[in-house]
Amino acid sequence: MFRHKNILLFIFPLIYLSCINPFAPGWDDEAGQQICPNLTEIEGVLCNFRNAYSFKDTTIYGNLLSPDFTFIYRDYDRGVDVSWGREEEMRITYGLFQSAQSLSIIWNKEIASSGDSLRKTVVFGFNLTITFNPSDIARVDGYANLTFERVGFTSPWKIVRWRDESNF
């Protein structure tokens, strides 16, 4: 009996040590932080927007826009606001994604916010970098006045209006 205990006391530590791989990479505690939050959060919409631009993916981008989406910008040369709907926005974005080698958008700190749990308007600063080729890189810094809507508290937010408030 005493001999069996000694053998077990010797075998269990060996079994435990055999499960440890000193060459395995460490556990990445931050990996989950790179995944986008749910679309029930505004941050989730912005994260997916960033991913759509980074991966040049119109499917991701299209899922963020409401069917009645409107894009608006100011044409300072003519002194008028120019706008278009979701269909034209998707066509223009597809063209941008096809012509750019890489895209990067960084959403800066929230500048202003108003609304409630079903409709919210938020103004963000952004930095957009469009690389057409290594010698043709466009950088745009501006402000996006975004209006988000959702049907219910647990429903995903959709962008219904994007007013570009950049001055270029």
Give, region by region, the residue ranges found by the protein language model.
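Surface-exposed, charged secondary-structure patches
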Residues: 84-136
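Short beta-strand edge/turn micro-motifs at domain boundaries
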Residues: 20-30, 121, 133-168
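Short, low-complexity N-terminal intrinsically disordered segments enriched in polar/charged residues
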Residues: 19-55
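Short, well-ordered alpha-helical segments enriched in acidic and aromatic residues
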Residues: 55-72
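A short gly/proline-enriched turn/hairpin at secondary-structure junctions
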Residues: 70-82
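Loop/turn elements at helix/coil->beta-strand transitions in domains of secreted/extracellular proteins
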Residues: 58, 101-103, 155-158
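Extracytoplasmic/secreted proteins, especially bacterial periplasmic and envelope-associated proteins
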Residues: 37, 41-44, 48, 60, ...
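Sec-dependent bacterial lipoprotein signal peptides
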Residues: 1-19
